[in-house]
Amino acid sequence: MLVTIQNAHPVGGTITAPPSKSMAHRAVLCAALAEGRSPITNLEFSKDISATLGAAAQLCARVRTGADDAVVEGLGHFVPLAAPVDCCESGSTLRFLIPIASLTGQAVTFTGRGRLMERPQSVYEALYREQGLRFEQSAAGLTVEGALTPGSYRLAGNVSSQFISGLLFALPLLAGDSTLHLIPPVESRSYIDMTRAVQAAFGVESRWQDENTLAIPGGQTYHPCDYAVEGDYSQAAFPAVLGAACGGVTITGLAPDTLQGDAAILDILRRCGARFTRTAEGISFEKAPLHGVDIDLADCPDLGPVLMVLGLLCEGTTVIRNAERLRLKESDRIAAMEAELRAVGGLVESEGGTITVQGCADRLHAPAGVLHGHNDHRVVMSLAVLSLATGIPLTVDDAEAITKSWPNFFEAIKPLGAEVEHVG
């Protein structure tokens, strides 16, 4: 799908952050593992969350959905699978479910789309092979079989925290106690603690034994509960960058006391010189001169694409470090954003996981043709921010990629001054 994005009027207005995708994944799975009825409110039925709901319904739950909520009724047991579990393009769905699949007593095959089956699963593969369990991965799908055993697990702390969270979901249900030893440095710690916090709401506990070791008692049971999903700082980063550059933007629906690692966007913007205030009504941005800073992406990799746009809008140089994982997302996000930003005159370079962006807002120009969304929701949304912040109309392909995380994105930005035309 092609869309053209441009300013209908000067940037300004109010936008409500969509529900947190990260928290919703976790709440749905905890509810599915709990015997009984768990209402989950404030849901956005993106493709990723729909994949997790669908998987829960296949494995161990009844799921009923409303306009912006769902009731997940855990059956208290796993059901025989009649078909593979389709994870669509959701890395969280796949990586969270692989250890859970070991509890089912059957072979479980996962399928996916896009680059999902190309994304590395070596952490799980090594663990499964070490325990003599089946782990077979190909472009067509991934099959696991066999029960994980309680005990001591060692994982690199600088790989995706999704592997750690996946084990956190399953290990409490084993008969014995387990420990997770994370080899430092431990990145995305906030996502690990988010998993633990959602589990705690459903009655399952773990604790940090020391800075890098999690103690997980076995023999636990998930209990149903009513769960309300917070607003999403990952998605709020897009209007936040726009507001920092242009002013006049207010974002509502974000909890001030949150475990979301991507809440770091506010500190990053503050360091860049952004001017904003937080009240009970939301976070309101005023226009202010922005300057480049040094950004560590280790704990907030999803912010990478929009921070590259931010770098163009700042005076001076922005350096983004520890961004290696961006190359293994729905696209190689570093290469994708480099290509598209250069097409409008952006000065961007990368080496490994370090990205250097030169502020050059006054040199940016209309591209020679269509920009590419690379089938990546965060690339598409970042390019929309670029268009609105600079006043340069942009036509972007693969725009349907937004349905992966924020299906209503184009409608949501219209009150901020966006005109979005579907052109093919």
Give the positions of each predicted feature.
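Short, structured segments at the rim of ligand-binding sites
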Residues: 1-424
